[in-house]
Structures are given as structure tokens and as C-alpha cells.
Regions:
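Conserved N-terminal beta-strand and adjoining loop/helix that marks the start
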Residues: 1-24
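Short secondary-structure boundary/capping segments
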Residues: 2, 26, 95-96, 113-115
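Short connector loops at helix/strand junctions that flank enzyme active sites
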Residues: 7-9, 31, 96-101
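Residue-level signal for short segments within beta-strands and strand-turn junctions
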Residues: 14-16, 28-29, 107-108
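Conserved Nudix-box catalytic region and its N-terminal flanking loop in Nudix hydrolases
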Residues: 21-64
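Short aromatic/basic micro-patch
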Residues: 35, 98, 124
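Active-site segment of metal-dependent pyrophosphate-handling enzymes
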Residues: 60-111
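NUDIX/MutT-family hydrolases
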Residues: 102-107, 112-145
Length: 152
């Protein structure tokens, strides 16, 4: 059994403008945690291709503009539990995961979201509300950096 895995993912700080206000998209995952759209980079994809695919799969938002000059990296480690652990063992993947997520800033004009099976809910929130709702400090740091970038 393989114990360790190193995995790369990509995520999007998806935002839209409404007048002079900015609204950021957060998804509620099955774990009940609120976060940005994100997912694995599949074989043969570059980061932008994976980002576009993940945003489409999770939200059905297709009209996006990716800002490649904004790239924020988050690294973390976790141990798979319960169903994920069993699935990883079956697939021969490590149960201790070193994860690297590259986040990009993504502008859209779409406000309608159609959720996939991975997500329970979504919200478009202003910066202050999004900072309160996000489920972890890493994501709050990414949002703060994105807001600073937009403001510059």
C-alpha cells in the first residue's frame, strides 16, 4: 500500500462586478466548508485548462477571464479519512497527502450558478462577508491577496 501522495490542484477566486462592488463566489462542499472552486489537474492539462474545466464542472460558469499574473500558492498536508481513505487504498493512492493548490483570479459576468454533486450550496459575497464565511486561514489569505491585486 502506498502511504504518501503529492498532488497538484488549481482553484479560482471567481469574482464579478456589480456597479462599483465586487462579489466573490464561494462554494459549500460536502464537508460543509466554504471555499473557492478548485480541483485536480488531470494528466495532459496545464493549470489554466484545469481551472477552466473545474469552474465549468462545479458551477457551469463558462464566461471567464483568467488573470494569469495573479497566482497564489497554498500548500498543506492531510490524512485521508473514512470514505476517502478507503477509496485511496482501493486505487493504490497514498493516504497521507501533500497538496499544492495554485489559485488564480477569475472574472466573470455570469451570476447564475448550477452546482454539481460535489457542492451543497453557493454564495456571491462581498469581500468582508467572504472573509467571514471562508473555512480556513489559507483561503482567507488568498482572498486578501486577490482583493489587494484587484485594488492595485
Amino acid at each position: 500500500m502506498k502511504l504518501f501522495s503529492f498532488e497538484k490542484s488549481v482553484g479560482g477566486v471567481v469574482f464579478r462586478k456589480q456597479g462599483s462592488e465586487l462579489f466573490f463566489l464561494l462554494l459549500q462542499y460536502r464537508s460543509y466548508q466554504w471555499d473557492f472552486p478548485k480541483g485536480h489537474i488531470e494528466q495532459g492539462e496545464n493549470e489554466e485548462q484545469a481551472l477552466r474545466r473545474e469552474i465549468w464542472e462545479e458551477t457551469k460558469i463558462k464566461d471567464i477571464e483568467v488573470y494569469p499574473v495573479f497566482r497564489s500558492i497554498v500548500r498543506y498536508f492531510y490524512a485521508a479519512k473514512k470514505n476517502e481513505k478507503a477509496e485511496r487504498i482501493r486505487e493504490g493512492r497514498g493516504i497521507y497527502i501533500f497538496k499544492k493548490v495554485a489559485y488564480y483570479l477569475v472574472l466573470t459576468s455570469q451570476s447564475k450558478v448550477e452546482l454539481d454533486f460535489e457542492n451543497k450550496d453557493y454564495l456571491w459575497l462581498n469581500f468582508e462577508e467572504a472573509m467571514k464565511k471562508l473555512g480556513n486561514d489559507d483561503s482567507r489569505g488568498v482572498l486578501k491577496a486577490a482583493k489587494n491585486f484587484i485594488g492595485s
